[in-house]
Amino acid sequence: MFRYTRFEKARIIGARALQIALGAPVLVDVPEGSTPLQAAIIEFEKGIIPITVIRPS
């Protein structure tokens, strides 16, 4: 998996949690009663968040 800075990680998880909260489908099986933030963290840990980071060269 690609190595992210703590700022990139926070932005990715936060953006994905917002998407999930607004109705986007969750791409992994999460326990019943999980919050959008918990679902986003699980997706991040499994490496399947559909967000790309582009760094300047």
Curated annotation (Swiss-Prot):
Keywords assigned: Cytoplasm, DNA-directed RNA polymerase, Nucleotidyltransferase, Transcription, Transferase
Biological process, per Gene Ontology: transcription by RNA polymerase I; transcription by RNA polymerase II; tRNA transcription by RNA polymerase III
Location of this chain's protein in the cell: Cytoplasm
EC top class, as a word: transferase
PROSITE patterns: RNA_POL_K_14KD (PS01111)
GO cellular component labels: cytoplasm; DNA-directed RNA polymerase complex
Enzymatic reactions: RNA(n) + a ribonucleoside 5'-triphosphate = RNA(n+1) + diphosphate
EC id: 2.7.7.6
Chain ranges passing through the membrane: none
Function recorded in the entry: DNA-dependent RNA polymerase (RNAP) catalyzes the transcription of DNA into RNA using the four ribonucleoside triphosphates as substrates.
Family stated for the protein in its record: Belongs to the archaeal Rpo6/eukaryotic RPB6 RNA polymerase subunit family.
Descriptive protein name: DNA-directed RNA polymerase subunit Rpo6
